[in-house]
């Protein structure tokens, strides 16, 4: 029987209200493959573990960074490891229980009919049951006519249901352990699976670094510079060779950028995190690789790296493969840089991979002129590249071709 227009409207309304990160991808087969799952505790309560150890201690040593599970956290780990008992087509690969969230990596074998949502939902229910046991809620004997606030009494009114809400954060038995929904990431290659395993393994160390140097991971929002104005941004687009020849494309590009820029009550603003001393440095150089200079890239790379090794801070959006090649070297040689980001920062944003450690070791600033926009796969348009490159020029106070004209 087809859905009525009213039912379709209700479904669409619920889907629109759901956070982007929790929406499922209609093109993904959730019945087979690798999945990296993240669950958050209700109200982000840090009740599953504590982080102990010292940064830099070798793995396996008593003082190595690790998560010390609470009794509830240990039960969560136990429930995760018993998933194959109920879903034989599922293989458990790795997991870590952080104070306020859970990471797990699993593999769903081809040919199975189980949906990932069913597997995760069963795991969440089992964890909530353990949580209720911890709280002393007699959930095994409860039923809808006997809410936890009125066991054994007269048939309750709807208002008597203490643990009921529209988002299913609670049931009539008690509060849930995890908030509704989960974030899933689908690693495709074995290399990506290995990256996720390493990410899980280093969670405790990352948290210790973040906790010890929290100022470096704090996002400073809506900051201003007298040189960073809307007219500067729009002129950077208008000066582009392509847009000079196409008035309509120029206006469309400028409007697109206006929609993405970070505005506050005063003007366009900047958000950033990391070692703010790098932003105040007088020794900054822009890195912008142009196709016209492709044959001279090795020369440009050599001069940029020489400058960085001599105390200069590289400023770049690291858009092109050549720019990213230099970024990789900067990271490997522990050299400082300022990275212009192609998206805004979410509330819980932090750098990932080697950039996380660069930030923790005061070697990096990430700065954004954009509003945050959730995208599974980000595509950078021409006008965004122009804006980010202009910001790198403003920060460094040097033109693109400085490396052709001077030696440092």
Task: Report each predicted region and the residues it spans.
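Short catalytic/metal-binding and nucleic-acid-binding patches
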Residues: 1-232, 236, 241
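Glycine-biased, small-residue-rich flexible motifs in mid-sequence functional cores and linkers
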Residues: 219-408
């Amino acid at each position: 029987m087809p859905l009525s227009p009213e039912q379709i409207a209700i479904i669409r309304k619920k889907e629109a209200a759901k956070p982007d990160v929790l929406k499922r991808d209609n093109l993904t087969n959730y019945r087979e493959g690798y999945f990296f799952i993240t669950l958050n505790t209700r109200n982000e309560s840090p009740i599953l573990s504590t982080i102990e150890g010292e940064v830099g201690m070798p793995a396996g040593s008593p003082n190595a960074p690790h998560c010390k599970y609470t009794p509830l956290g240990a039960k969560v780990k136990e429930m995760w490891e018993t998933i194959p008992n109920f879903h034989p087509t599922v293989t458990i690969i790795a997991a870590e229980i952080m104070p306020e969230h859970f990471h797990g990596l699993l593999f769903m074998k081809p040919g199975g009919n189980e949906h990932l949502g069913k597997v995760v939902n069963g795991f969440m229910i089992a964890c909530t049951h353990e949580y209720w046991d911890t709280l002393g809620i007699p959930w095994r004997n409860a039923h809808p006519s006997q809410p936890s606030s009125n066991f054994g009494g007269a048939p309750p009114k709807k208002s008597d249901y203490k643990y009921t809400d529209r988002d299913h954060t609670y049931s009539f038995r008690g509060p849930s352990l995890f908030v509704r929904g989960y974030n899933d990431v689908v690693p495709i290659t074995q290399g990506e699976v290995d990256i996720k395993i390493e990410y899980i393994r280093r969670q405790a160390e990352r948290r210790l670094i973040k906790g010890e140097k929290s100022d470096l991971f704090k996002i400073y929002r809506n900051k201003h510079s007298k040189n960073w104005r809307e007219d500067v941004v729009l002129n950077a687009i208008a000066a582009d060779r392509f847009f000079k020849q196409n008035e309509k494309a120029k206006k469309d590009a400028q409007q697109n950028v206006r929609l993405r820029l970070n505005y506050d009550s005063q003007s366009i603003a900047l958000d950033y995190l990391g070692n703010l001393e790098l932003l105040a440095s007088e020794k900054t150089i822009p890195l912008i690789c142009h196709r016209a200079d492709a044959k001279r890239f090795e020369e440009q790379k050599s001069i940029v790296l020489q400058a960085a090794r001599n105390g200069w801070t590289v400023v770049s959006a690291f858009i092109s493969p050549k720019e990213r090649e230099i970024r990789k070297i900067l990271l490997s040689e522990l050299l400082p840089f300022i990275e212009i980001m192609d998206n805004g920062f979410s509330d819980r944003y932090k750098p990932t991979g080697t950039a996380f450690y660069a930030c923790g070791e005061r070697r990096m600033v990430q700065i954004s002129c954009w509003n945050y926009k959730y995208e599974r796969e980000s595509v950078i348009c021409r006008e965004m590249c122009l804006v980010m490159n202009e910001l790198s020029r403003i920060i460094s106070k040097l033109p693109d071709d400085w490396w052709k004209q001077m030696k440092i």
